[in-house]
Amino acid sequence: MSKIKPLSKSSQDLSLLTSDIASFASSIGLASALPSSGFNDTDFRKPAKSKTQKRKKPKKDQQHKDEDEEGEPKSNIGNEKGKDFGARKQNKDAPVKQTLQPKPKPGFLSIDDESTGYKKKRFDEFKSLPKLPLVKASLLSSEWYNDAAEFEEKVFGGRKVAVANKEDFKGVVEKKRELGERLMWQYAEDFATSKGKGGDMKMVISAQKSGTVADKITAFEIMVGENPIANMRSLDALLGMVTSKVGKRFAFKGLKALSEILIRLLPDRKLKSLLQRPLNIIPENKDGYSLLLFWYWEDCLKQRYERFVTALDESSKDMLPELKDKALKTIYFMLTSKSEQERKLLVSLVNKLGDPQNKSASNADYHLTNLLADHPNMKAVVIDEVDSFLFRPHLGLRAKYHAVNFLSQIRLSHKGEDPKVAKRLIDVYFALFKVLTTEANRKQGADDKGAADKKKSNPKDTKQEVSTDSPIELDSRILSALLTGVNRAFPYVSTDEADDIIESQTPVLFKLVHSANFNVGVQSLMLLDKISSKNKIVSDRFYRALYSKLLLPSAMNSSKAEMFIGLLLRAMKNDINIKRVAAFSKRVLQVALQQPPQYACGCLFLLSEVLKSRPPLWKMVVQRESVEEEEDIEHFEDVIEGDDVDPNKKAENDENVVEVDHDGVEKSSRDGDSSSDDEEALAIRLSDEEDDNASDDSEELIRNETPQLEEVMEVSNDMEKRSQPPMRPSSLPGGYDPRHREPSYCNADRASWWELGVLSKHAHPSVATMAGTLLSGTNIVYNGNPLNDLSLTAFLDKFMEKKPKQNTWHGGSQIEPSKKLDMSNRVIGAEILSLAEGDVAPEDLVFHKFYVNKMTSTKQSKKKKKKKLPEEEAAEELYDVNDGDGGENYDSDVEFEAGDESDNEEIENMLDDVDDNAVEEEGGEYDYDDLDGVAGEDDEELVADVSDAEMDTDMDMDLIDDEDDNNVDDDGTGDGGDDDSDGDDGRSKKKKKEKRKRKSPFASLEEYKHLIDQDEKEDSKTKRKATSEPTKKKKKKKSKASE
C-alpha cells in the first residue's frame, strides 16, 4: 500500500493538469461538443502509454486480484462491472483509474442524440458480421428522397400499406433500427473505399482535422454534398458547432452553413420516423435493405433537424443581439423554405414579439409579415398562434402592442377564406379590449382602495388626488392599434356577421369616442362611420360626437389631422340634413380662423368639396344676417300660457332689426345672456321631438333654392295646435347659437359665412386666394395636399432651394405605405423668374418677388460700377506718373476704397430708393469729388510757388467759407424754407456739372518744363544767398564786440 500512494498522488496531479488544459482550450473555443470537429482535449494525452501502464498495474500489485479483474475492460466505461465496482469499492486507486482513462473517440457514425459521440464497440461488432446485399454508394444521386421513392415503387408497387399498432410495433422498430445502423455503416465503408482514396478527398479529410474554422466548415459542406448518407459524421460536426455553448463565433458561421445544407437535404414533404413506416412487411433482399437504409437515414435526419430547431430557439433567446438577429433570420428562412418543424419554428418566431428589446420585437413583426406575404394560406395558423400569445398571463403591454400591430398589418381580400379571417381578427381585437378594460378597472379599484386606506390612516391630510380619466382609458398606442386593425378588417367581413358585431360592439365604440386621446377618438368615429355607411343608418349620436371633436385644440395638431378632415368630408357629403351640414360648415370656418395656413387651406378645400354636393349652401356665402319686420313675412310666436310674460318682449318689439356686416363686425341692439342651464336642459329634452321634423325642414330647404321668404316654412295643422316651449334667446343675429351641442338645432342655416371675408385678407396668399375663390362663387381647383404642400417644412425646402429627392421611399407599413411629397414639378430657385407673376402659385409669390428684387439690385450695382470707371482710370494714370512712395500710398488708398465699396454694396442697394437731394441736404454722404478738387487746387498753388504765409491765409479763408456754408445750410434746413433748399439743390447740381467738365489737375511735364527750370535756378540762387548771409552776420557780431 505504501508503494501505491505516491503513484496515486502523481496521477492526481496529472489529471488536474489535463483538466486545466482542457478547460482552457474549451474557453478559447478550440474544443466543441464532438471530438470529430477537428480538436479535442484528448489530443494532449498519450493513450498508448496509459494503456501499457494500466496493463502493468496488475503485475505489480498482485494483492488486488479482484480489482485487476474488474479493471481489465477499460475500453467500456459504462459497463455493468465498472458500475458495480464503483458502488462496492471506495478505494483511492479507483478514481485514479477513472481519471486516467481517456474518453473514447467516436466512431464513424452515430444514431444517438447524446453529445458523447459514437459508440465504437458496436461498429467493431459490425466488422465481424457478414455484409448484406445493398445498393452501391456510387449509383445513387444527391437527392436521396428521389432514390427512396424509386425503391418504394419497386418494393410495394405503388400500393398503400397500413402501419401496424404502435404498441405491438415497438419491438419490430428496435430490431429494424439496429439493422439500419448496420446497413449505414456498411454503406459508409463502401463510400470510403470507392471515393475516399482520391487526392481531393484526402485533402478535404485533412482540412477537417487540422484546418481553420472556415476550412473545416467548407470541408464539412463538401462531404455532405458529396453523399449525405455516408457522411453523417460531417453533418453532426456542423450541428455540434451550432449547439455548442462554448465559442459563439462558431454559431455565427455554423448557422448559415447548416441551414443551407438542411434546406437541400429536406424534401418538400414532412419527414417520417421509423414508427410511421411499415417495417413488418419489408422484404429481406437487396431492394428491401436499400429501402430500409433510406428510411433509417430519414429518421436520423429528422432527429438532427429537431436538435437544430432547438438550438435556433436557444440562440434567439441569447443575450448577444447579433446572434439573436441571426437566429431570427434563420428561423424565417427555414419557415418559408420547408414545412418540417414549422410549428416549433412559428412558436419561436411569435415568442420574439415579447422580446424586451424593441429592435428584436420589430424584427419578429417584420419577419411574420413577410411570411404571410410569401405563404398567404398560413394566415389562420399564424393568427391562432398570436391569439394564444396575446392571452398569456402576465404578458406586458409592449408585447401586446407588437402583437396587435402585426395583426393590423395582415392583408385581406374578399376572396377565399379571407372574410372568415377578418371575422376572426375582429373577435381577437374586441376580446383583447375587454381583457384590457377589466384589468384597468381592477387596477383602478385597487388604487382607490389604497387611497381610501391611506386617507383613513392620515385623517389630517385633506388633499386627495381624484382621477378624472374614465375607466376606458388605456394605453393610447394599444387602443390606436386595435382600432386600426378593426377599421381595416371590418370592410371584409360578410354582411351577416357584421350585424352581430354592430349590435355588440357599438356601445364600446361610443365610449372610446370620448377618450382623452384624440387619435383614439378619431379612429372610433371612423369605424362608426363605416358601420353606418354599411347599414345605411344615420346616427345622430355619431354626428353629435363628431361636431364636438371640432372644437378640440388637438383636432388639427395631431398626427391624424388628414384622417380627421377626410372623415369630416365623408360625413358631410353623406348627410341629408342640410341644417346639420350648415352647422358643420360654420364650425369648420371658425376653426380655420385659428389654425396655421396649411390647415386653413385644408378647411377651405373641404368646404369647396362640400359645396359641390350641396349647392343650397352657396346662398349662405353672401346672405346677410338680419331679422327685419316686414309686412309680407309670416311670423310665428310661441303660445304663452298663464301670466308668463317675457321680460325682453318690449325690447324685441322696439328694436327687431339686427345686422352683421360681412367683415365680422356685429351690430346688435339686444342685451342679455345667451342661455341658461334650465333652458339648455329643456332644449336637449325636446331634441327627440325635433328629430322628426329635421328631415322635412331639410327637404324644404333643398327644394327652395331661390330665396323666397314667403315659402320658407310650412306648418301643418298638428304643428299649429301643438304648443311650443319658448326657445332660449340668442345673442347672435338670426338665432345662431354656436355653443349648442346638437348641430341640427343651432340655426346655422340662418347665419352668414362672414369668416370668408376675414380669410380673404389673410397674410398667407394661398389662404387669401382660396377664400376669395369661394366668395366669388366658384369652387377651388387644387390637385395637391395642402397639409403637406403648405407646411413650414415645405416652405423651408423651397427657401433653401432643395432639389427633389429620389423616387425611393422608406418607412410606412406595407398595407399603408407613407406618402412621399411630390417634388417633381416644383420650380426651385431662380427658375421661378421664367414664369410670369400671374402664372406663379400663390404660395410661391414670395419667392418670385424675392428673386425679382435680387435681380434688380444686381443690375443697379453693375450700373454704379460702370459710372465709376472714369475715376478709376484717373487713379490708374496717377499711379503710372507717381513711381515713388507717394504712388504706393495712393495705390493702397484706392484698394481700401474699392474694398469698402464692395463691402457696403448691399447697403448702397438698400439706399437706392432714397432721394439724393434729401441726402445732400442732410449731409449724409461724403462727396469724394470735393476732395479731388481740393487736392487739385493745392497742387496748382504748389506749382505756382506761393509763399507759406499766403497759403495759410488762403486755407483759413477757405475754412471760414466752408463754415459759413454749413451754417447757411443748417439754417435753411431748420427754417424749412423751400427757396433756400431749391437754391442749394441748383448750386449742388451746377457744382457737379462743373466738376464733371473740369480737366484733370495733373498737367503734362512738357507744358510746365520752363517753370520747373526757373524754380531750379531760383533754388540755386537762394542757396547762395543762404551761404553768404551767415558770414555777414558773423562780421556784424565781431564789430559789435570790438565796440
UniProtKB/Swiss-Prot annotation:
This is Protein SLOW WALKER 2. SUPFAM superfamilies: ARM repeat. Mainly expressed in actively dividing tissues (e.g. root tips, lateral root primordia, shoot apices, young leaves, inflorescences and pollen grains) through the plant, including roots, stems, leaves, inflorescences, siliques and seedlings, and in gametophytes. Residues 32-113, 444-469, 632-737, 861-1043 are annotated as: Disordered. One of its GO terms (cellular component) is nucleolus. The gene is SWA2. PANTHER family: CCAAT-BINDING FACTOR-RELATED, CCAAT_ENHANCER-BINDING PROTEIN ZETA. Pfam families: CBF. A motif (Nuclear localization signal 1) lies at residues 44-51. Together with NOC2, probably involved in pre-ribosome export from the nucleus to the cytoplasm. Required for coordinated cell cycle progression during female gametophyte and pollen development. Interacts with RBL in both the nucleolus and nucleoplasm. Binds to NOC2. Residues 80-95, 444-466, 646-673, 1006-1031 have a biased composition (Basic and acidic residues). Belongs to the CBF/MAK21 family. Disruption phenotype: Female gametophyte mutant with impaired progression of the mitotic cycles and lost synchrony of female gametophyte development leading to an arrest of female gametophytes at the two-, four-, or eight-nucleate stage and characterized by unfused polar nuclei. Defective pollen development. A motif (Nuclear localization signal 3) lies at residues 1022-1029. GO terms for biological process: embryo sac development; polar nucleus fusion; pollen development; regulation of cell division. A motif (Nuclear localization signal 2) lies at residues 441-448. It is found in: Nucleus; Nucleus, Nucleolus. Residues 47-59, 988-1000, 1032-1043 have a biased composition (Basic residues). Residues 632-645, 688-699, 872-983 have a biased composition (Acidic residues).
